[in-house]
UniProtKB/Swiss-Prot annotation:
It is found in: Cytoplasm. This is Ribosomal RNA small subunit methyltransferase G. Signal peptide: none annotated. S-adenosyl-L-methionine binds at residues 80, 85, 131-132, 146. The gene is rsmG. GO terms for molecular function: rRNA (guanine-N7-)-methyltransferase activity. Pfam families: GidB. It comes from Stenotrophomonas maltophilia (strain K279a).
Length: 212
């Protein structure tokens, strides 16, 4: 599928957001290519409930990139990534990061494979699988999950993927007091960091969790 042209205002919103977050303006062109592809495919395959490109910039791209300063080079598994969020924006922004995009939905996996191909992302691959069925135990330095389950639920289905000393980076809305209290034995919260996302009024927190 060819790219779908986006209004100039969408590019301006993204560029302003990147600037306010202190991120490189050179990230804008590949991010816009990804967004254009997502917008086009979404019309047919219903990959995300958000359909307005302006809203996609804020709630998908900038929200995903808010965690970028806390992501280290190495390997990262993005669990239940949907159409590639936050994994594809992170792969674009972090060339030293090897991202595995874990998603069991076939339509979303096909979209991501096409996006990875069109963007030439040599540091991203798609694993069409449920997280709990992925046979890659202890392989990842970092796990992330932006819209998947509670902290305990993420650990239950994906904790086996994390190497000793690795970290789970979980995107949450309001401070997740109850979820933290329900973490399994041996899993500890290292830090809860408030995040600021340009154009997003709601609370966002990044919860950093270490394994046993």
């Amino acid at each position: 599928m060819s790219e779908h042209p986006l209004p100039a205002s969408v590019a301006a919103t993204l560029e302003q957001g990147l600037a306010s977050m202190g991120l490189d303006a050179a990230l804008a062109p590949p991010l816009l290519r990804y967004l254009a592809l997502l917008h086009r495919w979404n019309g047919t395959y219903n990959l995300t409930a958000i359909r307005d490109p302006q809203e996609m910039v804020t709630r998908h791209l900038l929200d995903s990139l808010a965690m970028q300063p806390f992501v280290a080079d190495g390997s990262l598994a993005d669990l239940g990534t949907g159409p590639g969020l936050p994994g594809i924006p992170l792969a674009i922004a972090c060339p030293g990061l090897q991202v595995t995009l874990v998603e069991s939905n076939g339509k979303k996996a096909r979209f991501m494979r096409e996006a990875v191909r069109q963007l030439g992302l040599g540091n991203a691959r798609v694993a069409e699988s449920r997280a709990e069925a992925l046979d890659e135990a202890g392989r990842y330095d970092q796990l992330t999950a932006r819209a998947m389950d509670t902290l305990a639920g993420i650990v239950r289905v994906g904790g086996h993927l994390l190497r000793p000393g690795g970290v789970l980076l979980a995107m949450k809305g309001v401070y997740p007091h109850e979820e933290i209290a329900e973490l399994p034995a041996g899993w500890q919260v290292r830090e809860v960091t408030p995040l600021s996302v340009p154009g997003l009024a709601g609370e966002r927190h990044l919860v950093t969790v270490t394994g046993p």
